[in-house]
Amino acid sequence: MNSGGGLPPPSAAASPSSSSLAAAVAVVAPPGVGGVPGGAAVGVKLKYCRYYAKDKTCFYGEECQFLHEDPAAGAAPGLGLHSNSVPLALAGAPVAGFPPGAVAGGGAGPPPGPKKPDLGDPGTGAAAGGGGSSGGLDGPRLAIPGMDGGALTDTSLTDSYFSTSFIGVNGFGSPVETKYPLMQRMTNSSSSPSLLNDSAKPYSAHDPLTSPASSLFNDFGALNISQRRKPRKYRLGMLEERLVPMGSKARKAKNPIGCLADRCKSGVPINMVWWNRVTENNLQTPNPTASEFIPKGGSTSRLSNVSQSNMSAFSQVFSHPSMGSPATAGLAPGMSLSAGSSPLHSPKITPHTSPAPRRRSHTPNPASYMVPSSASTSVNNPVSQTPSSGQVIQKETVGGTTYFYTDTTPAPLTGMVFPNYHIYPPTAPHVAYMQPKANAPSFFMADELRQELINRHLITMAQIDQADMPAVPTEVDSYHSLFPLEPLPPPNRIQKSSNFGYITSCYKAVNSKDDLPYCLRRIHGFRLVNTKCMVLVDMWKKIQHSNIVTLREVFTTKAFAEPSLVFAYDFHAGGETMMSRHFNDPNADAYFTKRKWGQHEGPLPRQHAGLLPESLIWAYIVQLSSALRTIHTAGLACRVMDPTKILITGKTRLRVNCVGVFDVLTFDNSQNNNPLALMAQYQQADLISLGKVVLALACNSLAGIQRENLQKAMELVTINYSSDLKNLILYLLTDQNRMRSVNDIMPMIGARFYTQLDAAQMRNDVIEEDLAKEVQNGRLFRLLAKLGTINERPEFQKDPTWSETGDRYLLKLFRDHLFHQVTEAGAPWIDLSHIISCLNKLDAGVPEKISLISRDEKSVLVVTYSDLKRCFENTFQELIAAANGQL
């Protein structure tokens, strides 16, 4: 009879139902667990630790391979080998309550026979690593009207699609009275430890077999994702490279840090890194290439109990948690099977044990290619030196605490010669081959980029004449220097904003607290009654995204002679709305405009006339969907997905503007207890608004989104664009009778996402190349500024001839050599490359000789650039000392 809660005797490990890994794993089973008596495991020699028996302490602590108690008590659980052993459940032995092939916590055994197993059965082992049901493609496909020949009818559209267009207060989604059932969904990815807790409740999920993106479920089903990791740190001596003789005094040392440095005389290298302990939770993700990271010392690694050849067998045991396993109860809400990870889960897939991102990256420098110099290696207490790395680990004791550090004093490698930096490097080849113009400037940034930056600077520094615009206050709260970005509404204006239902105006202003420019969106005549909406404002402040204009603060003011509500956003100079860039042409609606009765209709416009390139539309889709994904992940809704509220900076960079305005203007007092009660409906409305924006872009006209023109608009899209774009529009505009997620359109975007990523990185390469030119230009300007403070100085220290004597005279002749060259005919010789080359040689101090001729041509001085640099530095330091009062 078994005493381990249903575990079989050790002989069961070799049963046919278990994997071939059982024989290799069973040798490290802990004693006293699962009915295996202490010391009965094959291949394990349980001995009493002689160091613990003598001093009642052991250097290795819990990591010691020997017992710290009397061997007679070895049958008690928890003794003998420690937590680095592999549990018997991994050796193919069934666990109580689970049939063979199923592992508690979501593990799976061999793939079952049925093709579509019941997801609720915990023993089917669905979605096992490399096995399980393929699903997805065999189930019924998601029927979307208009796709694959399906007819697009009015009944297939959402009720809110035709309720309003872009123009209107509620034109961004479904009406509030339309109630959608809030269905919590879950995903098959459960790698976030923060979401996996014992108190999580199970949530219902729709059948992934009917999902159009269920292939994603199968593609990611073979991933080995560990659910929890409990990192533990190794002390010095618990590392893999320790080679301490059994008779060494290092084992008896009391100092847990410096004992090996003081008493170990074997000279064996010791790896001075923190090593994450390999626990049974960490073993759920075996690394086939772990041998590359295991030190190749003379000792046997702790992982050697499981041979490298058997590591591949773990792929059948450690599988993705199946939906039918008890681990389903630990999944977090807000996860979707239809499109992989939902926005509530996707940003949290990184385990908390992963390395934290470095906010300050290390700048590459030549020191990374250097080794410690010979002077730095002659230390008093060298611990060890790794021959491969050439780094010396040194020990220093301060106040009884021993510190270990690695000396990284750089010294050039043998045979390595660095340039003296007086010659410009050529353009990077990957940038040179993508240059659109053959005559691109060599020393300055591109004219197009320069002009764009200058325009942004002009707009940022623009101010108004207060006498001409007295209606604009000089200061509003902590903001000053207001500049209207839109034409100010007349004082007697009655027409309200078509978007927010209030009269609005926009200003650029500078904050007195940080002197940074911001964009102020003023809501005229609004009185803030309930401050509970500030909870949503605080949530918006935390959102930082490249495609969202960040909200900084909201305040009320009476500086405009009436109560006003002001939203402060980041200011993006030079931005224009999508409406003004793409929908400002009145002739673009000719395709949808009907002529009067009795008039002959002229020929339809050419198919491609005035239409946007599909690549541009997909670039917009990627950015807008990315913004929606971030907003929905934060538990908020955009509600301003409108061409008038989407900013375009540069060529294709989008930013969603005016976020959070609707959350304050339409805040319901009945939502005091739960301000996020209606966010699920608003998020569904965001997807409909996104579909309308994409359809308007595809038609290049706002008339295409009207109900009477919808069929004609879809025909235009079908003729001129790909089926993927048509299907995406239909998916966003049709009612799917279920809660949708922005992640559902990611499979439709497909590989076009990589196209946009590639274009963005290529653009970054070009801008970095232009920046490199300006870095050199700034250095040369500072050099000229220093040179100008020396040349032709009328008097210094009461010496009127100071600039004409000594080292200053050489610098004066060098100035003539730079700028006052003439041709043989006596004409001025203007050569920018000559000036740049000579300045770079002066800055580098090259040993090249130069002939300096006096103005009367009676004397010639031959000096080197290194001599000129010495004269230049000494003279400038003399000026600095006099300016600081040190002379």
From Swiss-Prot:
It comes from Homo sapiens (Human). Residues 751-789 form a coiled coil. Belongs to the protein kinase superfamily. PAN3 family. InterPro entries: Kinase-like_dom_sf, PAN3, Pan3_PK, Prot_kinase_dom, Znf_CCCH, Znf_CCCH_sf. The gene is PAN3. Residues 790-887 are annotated as: Knob domain. Residues 463-750 are annotated as: Pseudokinase domain. The modification Phosphoserine is found at residues 354, 361. Homodimer. Forms a heterotrimer with a catalytic subunit PAN2 to form the poly(A)-nuclease (PAN) deadenylation complex. Interacts (via PAM-2 motif) with poly(A)-binding protein PABPC1 (via PABC domain), conferring substrate specificity of the enzyme complex. Interacts with the GW182 family proteins TNRC6A, TNRC6B and TNRC6. Interacts with YTHDF3. It is found in: Cytoplasm, P-body. The lineage of its organism: Eukaryota, Metazoa, Chordata, Craniata, Vertebrata. This is PAN2-PAN3 deadenylation complex subunit PAN3. Residues 298-307, 363-392 have a biased composition (Polar residues). It holds the Pfam family Pan3_PK. ATP binds at residues 521, 570-577, 644-645.
